[in-house]
Regions:
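Mid-domain alpha/beta scaffold segments of enzyme catalytic cores
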Residues: 1-212
Length: 212
């Protein structure tokens, strides 16, 4: 009911969260029912790129818990050369298409680049920008271009308030705020009763991650 689409913490309800795998740590099945895996620009280098790409694809192929590719993305503040970031991001896009999985995106100061890549690549799988904190005008522009947005603990309330309900998701990311509280806050911002709002969100989660 209170599905968390992106978290770095093991959930008390493993069947209601997508745990983001980083590095070589893979939780046991009893700890996490669903996983995402990708190459994060923070942890990317010329030396580890080929190895990480192999690791990511191997996990997608062999662990049925993987329901999304990511985090993957572009970050103007990351140490990795931007050209390498883009190469890795394109590789993650390819894996998302090949294995028919949604793509969870990390973006810092790179929305223009993301929009250009989406137009160039014409992906058939969903692109979900996680931890979105932009203003409502940017949110509306991204949604018009087919992106989904995922909101965590911190965001502009007016951005969440104006979006169609089938275009955004909720996540804890690294926050200690319970996911149910984030649902409560979002429902309040949108003037919705909590339970009907949660049911509508569950329908979107199912359509994006579990309709295969």
């Amino acid at each position: 009911m209170w599905f968390d689409v992106h978290t770095h913490q093991l959930s008390a309800c493993p069947s209601e969260a997508i745990f983001n795998c980083e590095g070589s740590y893979i939780p046991m099945p009893g700890e996490a029912a669903f996983l995402s895996v990708g190459i994060h620009p923070w942890y990317l280098s010329k030396e580890n790129y080929s190895h990480r790409l192999h690791e990511v694809e191997a996990l997608i192929k062999h662990d049925k818990r993987v329901v999304a590719v990511g985090e993957a993305g572009l970050d103007k503040y990351a140490e990795a050369p931007f050209a390498l970031q883009e190469e890795a991001f394109r590789a993650m896009c390819f894996l998302a298409e090949q294995y028919r999985l949604p793509l969870i995106i990390h973006s810092v100061k790179t929305y223009n680049e993301l929009m250009a890549l989406k137009k160039a690549l014409h992906p058939s799988q969903s692109w979900i920008i996680h931890g979105f904190r932009g203003k409502k005008e940017l949110a509306q522009s991204l949604v018009r271009q087919g992106f989904y947005l995922s909101f965590g603990e911190h965001y502009h309330p007016d951005a969440l308030a104006v979006l169609p309900e089938d275009t955004f998701l909720l996540e804890t990311d690294e926050s200690c705020v319970p996911i149910k509280e984030l649902y409560r806050r979002a429902a309040s911002i949108r003037g919705r009763e909590l339970m009907p709002f949660a049911v509508r969100m569950e329908q979107l989660v199912n359509s994006l991650f579990f309709n295969r």
